[in-house]
Amino acid sequence: MGPTASGKTDLAIALRQTLPVEVISVDSALIYKGMDIGTAKPSKAELELAPHRLIDILDPSESYSAMNFREDALREMAEITASGRIPLLVGGTMLYYKALLEGLSPLPSADPEIRAEIEAKAEQIGWSGLHRELLAIDPIAGKRINPNDSQRINRALEVFYITGKTMTELTAQQGDSLPYNVLQFAIAPQDRAVLHQRIEQRFYKMMELGFQQEVEKLRARSDLHKDLPSIRCVGYRQMWEYLDGDISLDEAIYKGICATRQLAKRQITWLRGWNSEITWLDSLDPTSSKLKMIEKIAQNSIKL
């Protein structure tokens, strides 16, 4: 696990050459076909060294949930373990990890009518007013959700209106836990400035590789639009705004870099608040040092 641009892929390839592992991608962007440059998808050469499961499995017009991921990942893990090898899950989509490790809480599906009612109420009293209502109903969720985060406020209230139970109550009712012994490692540079520099350098490299042309090709499709989960991926939505004429290219690049840094910050926040025990690895340490640490811990838990 780890934030974007932390070196997860390189370490996974090194592990693939050292241990009897098979890689499963845990990334909500890498699942999409035709979105290679902006997602920093492993190259053909990298995939030959370490094939990744659960990448390029969907068209950008399709949606995918944490529940879908859990089902697919469990299937792949069963197949890998049956062959006598070890599943190595690699990626930065923390919600997918959470769903896999803890199961899924029984939250209801969205109800368009109730959402419309909530939005109508927001027009009358504002989202700050609805946030105060949420604080009264579900103090824990209310304190966790930013007063300006209308999407999450809407969802938390919607869940309560549908079920009569708060989001906090329902998320405590998790599904089946993962039926495997799990070792968890997180990789990130200790110095946040290093990660920020890597993100900026990688974004400019993606531009050199043809990221704009990749988005132009997607935008030319009549079935794709900016509100799809695929196009909302960081970098893609900013480049889409540029192609729509809403911002300049320089602004798109700047906003894309900023959005990627914000994503990395959220990923690190998730990891620091993780309930399970995690072994942290410094991205700047030699690969050999990281491999030795992983092998040492693994040998005490798994028969290699």
UniProtKB/Swiss-Prot annotation:
- Chain positions covered by the region annotation Interaction with substrate tRNA: 27-30, 151-155, 232-237, 265-272
Catalytic activity annotation: adenosine(37) in tRNA + dimethylallyl diphosphate = N(6)-dimethylallyladenosine(37) in tRNA + diphosphate
Residues reported in the UniProt entry to bind substrate: 4-9
Q: Which GO terms describe its biological process?
A: tRNA modification
Provide the cofactor list for this protein: Mg(2+)
Asked if ATP-binding is a keyword of the record, the answer is yes
- EC top class named in words: transferase
Q: What InterPro entries does UniProt report for this protein, alphabetically?
A: Dimethylallyltransferase (IPR039657), IPT (IPR018022), P-loop_NTPase (IPR027417)
Positions of ATP binding: 2-9
Which keywords appear in this protein's UniProt record, sorted alphabetically? Answer: ATP-binding, Magnesium, Nucleotide-binding, Transferase, tRNA processing
Q: Which Gene3D superfamilies match?
A: 1.10.20.140, P-loop containing nucleotide triphosphate hydrolases
Site description Interaction with substrate tRNA, residues in chain: 93, 115
Q: Name one GO molecular function term.
A: tRNA dimethylallyltransferase activity
EC number per UniProt: 2.5.1.75
Q: Function, please?
A: Catalyzes the transfer of a dimethylallyl group onto the adenine at position 37 in tRNAs that read codons beginning with uridine, leading to the formation of N6-(dimethylallyl)adenosine (i(6)A).
Which PANTHER family does the UniProt entry name for this protein? TRNA DIMETHYLALLYLTRANSFERASE
| Family named by the database record | Belongs to the IPP transferase family.
Query: Assembly state and interactors?
Result: Monomer.
The record's HAMAP family line, in alphabetical order, gives: IPP_trans
NCBIfam families associated with the record: miaA
Q: What is this protein called?
A: tRNA dimethylallyltransferase
This chain's source organism reads Actinobacillus pleuropneumoniae serotype 7 (strain AP76)
Q: Which gene encodes it?
A: miaA
